[in-house]
Structures are given as structure tokens and as C-alpha cells.
A protein has these predicted regions:
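Membrane-interface junctions
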Residues: 26-27, 43, 67
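Contiguous, function-dense segments enriched for cysteine-driven chemistry
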Residues: 32, 65, 69, 82-85
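Recognition helix of helix-turn-helix/homeodomain-like DNA-binding domains
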Residues: 55-73
Length: 94
């Protein structure tokens, strides 16, 4: 099994996906978080499934979360994609 297949399998687990996104967010580089969220979306059925579940346009998701990780999703799109992936954003004191 290659790394991408292993990661995709792990990202189906809510706790692992939450930890993965938390670590990506701590990098403070938006492209890292955007790429990580794309990995989670792909592992959970892909952009088409998340678009349907989140009532988002597929085109807007493909633009917001390109494979390169260089998308620039709006907060609305990012929160909707997280919810449609079964996750939510939370905050805690540093």
C-alpha cells in the first residue's frame, strides 16, 4: 500500500481527520491547510459528493480546492466543505 492510499484510509476516521487538519492549520500557511482539507474531501468521497452534501456548486469546490493546494476558498465555502465532510472548526486558547 502506498502512502496516498494509507492516508486516504486514515482520513475516513473523524478523529484522525480532525487531528490532521489541526496540524495543517498550525502551519500558518493557507496553502497547507487548503491542501489538507482537499485530502480529507477526497478521502470522504471526493468533491462531487461533498458539493452535493454541502449544497455547493462543484465548480466552486474545484476552484477553491485544486489539487495543487493553491486555492483560496471563502470562509463560507470552507465551512460548508468541512460540515459536508462531517467535521467542524473549533477553537481553543493557545
Amino acid at each position: 500500500m502506498n502512502h496516498d492510499d494509507w492516508l486516504s484510509g486514515q482520513l475516513k476516521d473523524d478523529a484522525f481527520a480532525a487531528h490532521y487538519l489541526t496540524q495543517a492549520a498550525q502551519d500558518l500557511e493557507p496553502a497547507v491547510f487548503t491542501a489538507a482539507l482537499r485530502h480529507v474531501i477526497d478521502a470522504r468521497g471526493g468533491l462531487a459528493k461533498v458539493a452535493d452534501a454541502g449544497k455547493l456548486s462543484r465548480q466552486s469546490l474545484y476552484k477553491a480546492f485544486p489539487v495543487t493546494g493553491k486555492g483560496n476558498p471563502t470562509a463560507k465555502t470552507m465551512f460548508a466543505a468541512l460540515r459536508a465532510s462531517g467535521l467542524q472548526l473549533t477553537f481553543k486558547a493557545a
